[in-house]
Each structure stands twice: as structure tokens, then as C-alpha cells.
């Protein structure tokens, strides 16, 4: 009962951290620590999300698993380019555009006129590769949902691929890419309009 009532900084005591919105949590970065040495979660942020439509990948592959992996690889590179566009759009932003966020401590304590660039690297912020349609992708590719042994195997392989790509990009660019279960409330409509 007491645990369910804890909020904010009290939650840190029990290694439970509130999310940044619906489903995005800051990653645990060794480079981000408070002055007392504990991991820093509060004041960090997410640069944005780009979502891969796994159902479209499966439908485009027409049930052929080799083709599925080729298309997935291609779409992941497209997502990576889009994520880089989001990141690069933020580069050069000066703290003056949102003083409460960047100067007065909501996210940082930068000087007037200072850019937020250093906050976009080295784990201070994350940028997310979202995914949508994992269950439906499994049904299209295996005829079974992600809760069946066949579907679960494919779902885990795909999730591992997404994680591996984020790790690869992070190591190459020093930008903290993360995997994010995209809320489908508005994304479904956007995907439907594109098909």
C-alpha cells in the first residue's frame, strides 16, 4: 500500500522510475550520474520517436521470411535516417527558446545563449525507435500470434534485431537510441492513411 503511493524522487529509493510520457523511460547510463554518484534519471529527456510499421513489413514480404528480413533491414535504415533528422533538427537550439526547460532546471541549467547540443549526446537524452504491430506481424508471417511458440520465436527475433540496431547506432554515434512500444491510438490512423 505504501509503495503504490510513492511518487517522484521517493520512487528512486526503490529503483522504480516514472516514465517520460506513455511508455518511454530514460535508459540507465553510466555516464549520467548525480553528484552523489547515483544514476541520474530526473531532468533527462527523449528527443522523439520514429515508428516502424511491422505489419507493413510482413505484408510487403508476402509471408516469405527471407524477404521479411530484407525489408525489415531496409525499413530500419529508413527509420535511422528519420531519427537522425530529428536529432539534427535539435542541434544548435539555444537554451533561450525554452528557459524553464533549459536554463531553470526542468531539464538542464544552461547559460543564456548556450546550445543544448551537449545534452543530445552521451546518454543525457534518448531518441527512440518505436515499433507497432508485433502481434499482427506474427500472424501474417506464421499464422500464429506472438503468444504461441512459433509467433513468440519470431517476435523475440524481431525485438532482438531492433535492440541490436539501436546498440549499433549508439556505438557509432554516441546518441542513446532506445526501443519504444509506440502508442497506437493515433499511429494507427497515420499508418492507414499511408497504405
Where are these regions (language model features)?
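Extended amphipathic alpha-helical segments with heptad-repeat/coiled-coil character used for oligomerization
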Residues: 170-195
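Secondary-structure capping and boundary motifs in well-ordered enzyme cores
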Residues: 44, 102-107, 118-130, 151-158
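Catalytic phosphate/nucleotide-handling subdomain of diverse soluble enzymes
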Residues: 151-169, 174
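Short glycine/threonine-rich loop-to-helix capping motif typified by GTGT followed
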Residues: 105-108, 145-147, 186-195
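Function-dense linear segments that define catalytic or interfacial modules
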Residues: 14-116
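Inter-helical turn/loop segments and adjacent helix faces that build the functional surface
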Residues: 58-72, 140-152, 169
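Contiguous, well-ordered alpha-helical segments that form the cores/surfaces of helical PPI scaffolds
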Residues: 127-140, 160
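Single conserved hydrophobic/aromatic residue that forms the stacking wall/gate
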Residues: 1-8, 13
Amino acid at each position: 500500500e505504501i509503495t503504490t503511493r510513492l511518487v517522484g524522487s521517493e520512487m528512486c529509493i526503490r529503483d522504480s522510475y516514472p516514465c517520460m510520457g506513455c511508455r518511454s523511460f530514460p535508459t540507465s547510463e553510466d555516464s549520467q550520474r548525480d553528484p552523489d554518484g547515483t544514476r541520474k534519471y530526473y531532468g533527462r529527456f527523449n528527443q522523439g520517436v520514429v515508428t516502424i510499421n511491422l505489419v507493413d513489413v510482413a505484408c510487403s514480404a508476402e509471408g516469405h521470411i527471407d524477404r521479411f528480413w530484407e525489408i525489415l533491414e531496409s525499413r530500419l535504415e529508413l527509420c535511422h535516417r528519420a531519427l537522425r533528422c530529428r536529432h539534427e533538427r535539435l542541434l544548435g537550439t539555444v537554451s533561450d527558446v525554452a528557459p524553464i526547460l533549459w536554463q531553470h532546471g526542468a531539464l538542464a541549467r544552461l547559460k543564456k545563449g548556450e546550445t543544448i547540443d551537449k545534452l543530445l549526446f552521451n546518454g543525457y537524452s534518448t531518441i527512440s525507435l518505436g515499433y507497432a504491430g508485433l502481434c499482427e506481424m506474427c500472424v501474417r508471417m506464421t499464422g500464429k500470434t506472438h503468444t504461441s511458440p512459433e509467433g513468440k520465436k519470431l517476435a523475440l527475433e524481431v525485438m532482438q534485431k531492433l535492440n541490436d540496431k539501436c546498440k549499433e547506432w549508439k556505438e557509432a554515434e554516441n546518441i542513446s537510441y532506445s526501443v519504444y512500444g509506440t502508442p497506437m491510438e493515433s499511429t494507427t490512423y497515420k499508418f492507414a492513411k499511408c497504405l
